């Protein structure tokens, strides 16, 4: 029913790792214009939406659109077996009702094949979130990762407070405190503030956002007061990943 050839195996490792971190399984949609995935954590505090347009694949052939539930943990294990010389080929095995993942070495020509059985076929249509954040900023992925690692040293929660001209990230616990004041031209690549905002997020949930950093240079972060945070990655070939983090009432 479909055959997809993806040449950026190193990038897919970051993608698969992120999806598996949120949940062991998720909905995958193979449509005429691209591959999409929708993964929500069991406690509903985090959500990942992946979009890989057909042009991001070397070969993209879908005869009939379909949605299936697949094990993201199995995809993650398989992606770890890929080398930088491997193409990743996705095909649907109708007889086994499974996703066939082939790792084909471009230089040597040999292949390794794996099967990921579908938990279910014909899953519900994926829903998109409609949020209205009041703050958006862009930051280098390395700086985002450093920030979250800093917070981990201090506490379990991070407070984000934005006002005109700056975003301040704070954390505190057991007589330890952390604060990072970020401004455009300093750390922030861009900043838009429609309304001052303050919200707290779990550090454990935020750590999920560090998984794709090796595949993108910058990331867009959006939030509002006591409102879900959206973290958006755009990769070089048009792939996109949106991560949504629920605010925390603790902290």
From Swiss-Prot:
CDD domains: PCNA. Keywords: DNA replication, DNA-binding. Heterotrimer. The subunits circularize to form a toroid; DNA passes through its center. Replication factor C (RFC) is required to load the toroid on the DNA. It comes from Aeropyrum pernix (strain ATCC 700893 / DSM 11879 / JCM 9820 / NBRC 100138 / K1). NCBIfam families: PRK01115.1-1. SUPFAM superfamilies: DNA clamp (SSF55979). This is DNA polymerase sliding clamp 2. GO terms for molecular function: DNA binding; DNA polymerase processivity factor activity. One of its GO terms (biological process) is regulation of DNA replication. Sliding clamp subunit that acts as a moving platform for DNA processing. Responsible for tethering the catalytic subunit of DNA polymerase and other proteins to DNA during high-speed replication. Belongs to the PCNA family. InterPro entries: DNA_clamp_sf (IPR046938), Pr_cel_nuc_antig (IPR000730), Pr_cel_nuc_antig_CS (IPR022659), Pr_cel_nuc_antig_N (IPR022648).
């Amino acid at each position: 029913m479909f055959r997809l050839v993806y040449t950026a195996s190193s990038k897919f490792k970051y993608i698969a790792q992120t999806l598996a971190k949120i949940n062991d399984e998720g909905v995958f949609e193979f449509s005429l214009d691209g591959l999409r995935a929708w993964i929500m954590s069991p406690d509903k505090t985090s959500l990942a939406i992946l979009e890989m347009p057909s042009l991001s694949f070397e070969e993209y052939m879908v005869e009939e659109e379909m949605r299936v539930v697949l094990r993201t943990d199995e995809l993650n294990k398989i992606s770890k077996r890929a080398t930088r010389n491997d193409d990743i080929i996705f095909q649907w095995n109708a007889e086994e009702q499974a996703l066939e993942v082939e790792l084909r070495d471009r230089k040597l020509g040999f292949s390794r094949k794996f099967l990921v059985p579908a938990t279910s076929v014909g899953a519900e249509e994926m829903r998109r979130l409609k949020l209205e954040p009041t703050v958006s900023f862009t930051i280098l992925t390395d700086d985002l990762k450093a920030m979250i690692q800093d917070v981990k040293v201090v506490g379990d929660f991070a407070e984000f407070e934005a006002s005109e001209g700056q975003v301040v990230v704070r954390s505190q616990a057991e007589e330890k405190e952390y604060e990072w004041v970020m401004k455009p031209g300093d750390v922030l690549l861009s900043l838009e503030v429609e309304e001052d905002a303050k919200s707290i997020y779990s550090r454990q949930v935020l750590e999920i956002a560090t998984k794709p950093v090796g595949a993108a240079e910058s990331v867009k972060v959006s939030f509002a007061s006591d409102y879900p945070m959206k973290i958006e990655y755009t990769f070089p070939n048009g792939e996109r990943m949106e991560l949504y983090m629920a605010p925390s009432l603790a902290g």
